[in-house]
Amino acid sequence: MYPDATIVCGKPEMEDEKFDTLKNPSVLFEVLSPSTEDHYRGKKFFFYRQIPTLKEYVLINTTKYFVEISRRQEDNSWMFEEISNPDSYLNINTIDFRIPLEELYKNVLQ
């Protein structure tokens, strides 16, 4: 399973037998399509939650302003946030980054 984009804090650690398999992602991004969104919310997220270094999992809808962020808490539970207002910001807390949804979706939604 490979995400659409990844952020790694620190030095990337790769699986010995597979150079393209990252062991220590901090943030994973998936760009949703109608045919993949259930898979990304279900089986894929279940698998990703097992990665101890993962702090945030971001799902980006391609048909409307809608981003879902799951964040690992200190007790290892996950907190869920939805953002759908174009004037709102997507915050990636792991790297102290924020972007307005309107900018994220520029040239995607007309």
Regions found by a protein language model. Name each.
Residues M1-I51, L59-Q110:
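C-terminal interaction segment
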